[in-house]
Amino acid sequence: EAEEAARLQAEAEEAARQQAEAEEAARLQAEAEEAARLQAEAEEAARLQAEAE
């Protein structure tokens, strides 16, 4: 019984670790999308600047 409880505890900890990794991956994905958006805005600003000159 104690061994089963310990095994279930270890499985729960592994599941929590995987959940945390998935949340970190989602956060990094969102940061990458924001960086891409800012890059596109910078390129658009540079294009408008070139047109204005």
Curated annotation (Swiss-Prot):
Keyword match Membrane: yes
Subcellular location(s) per record: Membrane
GO CC annotations, alphabetized: membrane
Highest taxon of the lineage: Eukaryota
Keywords annotated in UniProt: Membrane, Repeat
Ranges of the Sequence repeats in the UniProt entry: 1-10, 11-20, 21-30, 31-40, 41-50, 51-53
UniProt region (Disordered), positions on chain: 1-53
Region (6 X 10 AA tandem repeats): 1-53
Signal peptide span: none
Key word Lipoprotein present: no
This protein's name: Membrane antigen containing repeating peptides
